[in-house]
Every structure is written in C-alpha cells, then in structure tokens.
C-alpha cells in the first residue's frame, strides 16, 4: 500500500523547494495525497478493510494538519500547493 521509489522521487522532485528537500510541508502533503489517492482505489475493491481505513484516516488527518500549518505560515505557498494538487475544489 505504499508508493514505489520512482513515484516518490518524482513527487519529491516536483514539489521540493531545494535540491535535497524532502521534509518541507509541500513535499509531505504531496506524498500523503498520492498515498491517499492510492488507498482510495484499494477501498473501492476491499470495502471491509477496516484496519487499512484507520490508516487512511490517519493520513488524511496528518495532511490536514500540515495544510493548516502551511496556511498559517505562508498563505501564498498554501494556495499554490492546493492548486497543484487539485484539492479544495
């Protein structure tokens, strides 16, 4: 249920702010969004996977916290990120 190394590297390259940036809120939110999207497909097939659903809810909560932090610290970066990821339609 995790992303492969190539997908993670591509996401990090797309959303990083510097060369070795893997911990910025933008990168973390992008990685969580990719994992959440992957798990949504999993739950369409395995609807009774309640343990996996708990992990999904934890990821959604963590993404929400990171987005709140980013919005509080730098609103322009927040708006740019949600437009790139297609969140908040």
Swiss-Prot record:
Keywords: Ribonucleoprotein, Ribosomal protein, RNA-binding, rRNA-binding. GO terms for molecular function: rRNA binding; structural constituent of ribosome. Pfam families: Ribosomal_S15 (PF00312). It comes from the Bacteria. CDD domains: Ribosomal_S15p_S13e. The keyword RNA-binding applies. One of its GO terms (biological process) is translation. InterPro entries: Ribosomal_uS15 (IPR000589), Ribosomal_uS15_bac-type (IPR005290), uS15_NS1_RNA-bd_sf (IPR009068). SUPFAM superfamilies: S15/NS1 RNA-binding domain (SSF47060). GO terms for cellular component: cytosolic small ribosomal subunit. PANTHER family: RIBOSOMAL PROTEIN S15, BACTERIAL AND ORGANELLAR, SMALL RIBOSOMAL SUBUNIT PROTEIN US15M. One of the primary rRNA binding proteins, it binds directly to 16S rRNA where it helps nucleate assembly of the platform of the 30S subunit by binding and bridging several RNA helices of the 16S rRNA. Forms an intersubunit bridge (bridge B4) with the 23S rRNA of the 50S subunit in the ribosome. Belongs to the universal ribosomal protein uS15 family. Part of the 30S ribosomal subunit. Forms a bridge to the 50S subunit in the 70S ribosome, contacting the 23S rRNA. This is Small ribosomal subunit protein uS15. It comes from Tolumonas auensis (strain DSM 9187 / NBRC 110442 / TA 4). The gene is rpsO.
């Amino acid at each position: 249920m995790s992303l492969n190394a190539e997908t993670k590297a591509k996401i990090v390259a797309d959303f990083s702010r510097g060369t070795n940036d893997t911990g910025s809120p933008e990168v973390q939110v992008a990685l969580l969004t990719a994992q959440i999207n992957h798990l949504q497909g999993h739950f369409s097939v395995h609807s009774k996977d309640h343990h996996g659903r708990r992990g999904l809810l934890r990821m959604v909560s963590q993404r929400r916290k990171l987005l709140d932090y980013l919005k509080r610290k730098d609103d322009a970066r927040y708006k740019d990120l949600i437009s790139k990821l297609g969140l908040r339609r």
